[in-house]
A protein has these predicted regions:
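C-terminal catalytic region of ATP-dependent kinase domains
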Residues: 30-151
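Conserved kinase catalytic-core segment
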Residues: 1-49
Length: 151
């Protein structure tokens, strides 16, 4: 779930929020579960549709601010370790995405009516060093205030 939260911060996904997870949990044999990510129609930040800059999702809109996150992340020490491990991999994940960007964009359904070419500049922003640093800082902050030190 931490990967999903970081992904949402990176893309500024406003569609998955503390009260609209857009996730399905399926129980499988052996007491395990599979988490499915669903409903990605509104994954792109609403500022993408307008002549605005990319904006981070708010802490209130982050899945890290959900009851589900509070339930899943009970062990502060383990959560911090997982966060640090994930952030070490974050540049690799984003580079992999950038390397495969055209293939990924080709999979965006036509029915979403997104003119990807007109959003190229904003899409390119998510790969900049500044944006990645902002996302890392925001992710750490949201974990600290929404999970570790939640009132």
């Amino acid at each position: 779930m931490l990967k999903i939260a970081l992904f949402d911060i990176w893309l500024s996904n406003e569609d998955r929020t503390f009260n609209n997870y857009n996730l399905l949990l399926q129980a499988i044999k052996g007491g395990f579960s599979i988490l499915y990510i669903i409903d990605n129609t509104e994954i792109f930040n609403s500022s993408m549709a307008y002549d605005q800059s990319m904006e981070l999702i708010t802490q209130d809109d982050s899945i890290l601010n959900s009851k589900l996150a509070t339930f899943v992340f009970k062990n502060d020490t383990e959560t911090v370790r997982e966060m640090n491990d994930l952030l070490k991999e974050f540049p690799i994940f984003t580079k992999n995405c950038q390397d495969n960007l055209q293939s990924i964009l080709n999979q965006v359904p036509q029915k979403w009516h997104i003119d990807l070419q007109s959003h190229k500049t904003k899409i390119d922003i998510i790969f900049t060093e500044d944006w990645l640093k902002i996302c890392e800082h925001t992710f750490r902050k949201y974990i600290q205030t929404s999970i570790i030190h939640k009132p």
